[in-house]
Amino acid sequence: MKIVGLLSGGKDSCFNLCHCVLNGHEIVALATLAPTQGKDEIDSYMYQTVGHDAVHAIATALDVPLYRAEIRGTALNQGAVYGERDPTKECVSSLEDETEDLYRLLLRVKEKHPDIEGVSVGAILSNYQRVRVEHVCCRPDLRLASLAYLWK
């Protein structure tokens, strides 16, 4: 399956990409969310931003395009459940929630690479991240499989 790798620049997102390749998937693009210009790190429930400035080097090494977006939202919906349980219904979360930044980024990647069917995710122990990534992936205009080989 052709996939996009969500990449923070950290070891977990990179290691998960290795697992994707070992499982026969083809990385066709990378995507990253970074702090607004002038900030190196932000306090985010959803995103690791410490290594965001090195992500371009990984994309160059893999010879795949890199899609970047700024993290504009904040963690408005901090509950265990995100949005509607039925992914065919419109998300009831605020457009200002940081999770929606991921949705907009993946939508942009999917428009450029309509053959992408999955997303590599380096989440290990965070149900908070897993629930939100899965919610975004199963929206009708994306329909992507979440590939989190490192999960627990």
Per-segment meaning from a language model:
Residues 1-152:
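ATP-dependent adenylation/nucleotidyltransferase module used to activate substrates
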